[in-house]
């Protein structure tokens, strides 16, 4: 009975630890008849062992073995990974168009809907910013471009739209720049008109100075002293 008690003690300890060793086929011959129920119970326990998420139970003839597969990792279609994928969707950076220069802040905020901020709002690095000009990039040559069109005759765009049929984006990349250029030309014309008016005023002042009595030769008239600035007197008068 002593070996049977030791066997029961070992089984209880190992079951408390979470692992039940399976009895070997050679042990059955060395054990007595009184140990047969215990061995049968241990074999039943091995067969009824529930495999965890990373283990597989393989039952052989007369014995049960546990093949651990924890090193292989969870399967791709496990429910845990599906829940993680549903809970944390991938972050997709949307981009409507590509600006030709990062100095155009309005274009940067319009095209790049997701902006990476660095240190301060003044220093921004838009996602996907590049100098891509599409088909409007010309070669370094003085000759005509394909299609007999010079680069200067092509419309100067401030950005390149991702979607070809995005009318709002195309309108922003073309019409907005035209409005700004028109405003600049209007400012230039206003400044030119102001300059012309100033030149005319200076010319009129010079003409008045030439007709002044002090500057006219042989008039014999001069301005009175500072005590009487409005008085005129004739030279040589008593």
From Swiss-Prot:
Expressed in trophoblasts and placental stem villi vessels, but not in cultured placental smooth muscle cells. Residues 159-173 are annotated as: Endothelin-like. Changing residue 224 to T: Probable risk factor for HSCR4. The record marks 117-118 as: Cleavage. It is found in: Secreted. One of its GO terms (cellular component) is extracellular region. One of its GO terms (biological process) is positive regulation of hormone secretion. Keywords: Cleavage on pair of basic residues, Deafness, Disease variant, Disulfide bond, Hirschsprung disease, Secreted, Signal, Vasoactive, Vasoconstrictor, Waardenburg syndrome. Residues 185-212 have a biased composition (Basic and acidic residues). Disulfide bonds join 97-111, 99-107. The keyword Signal applies. Endothelins are endothelium-derived vasoconstrictor peptides. PANTHER family: ENDOTHELIN, ENDOTHELIN-3. Belongs to the endothelin/sarafotoxin family. This is Endothelin-3.
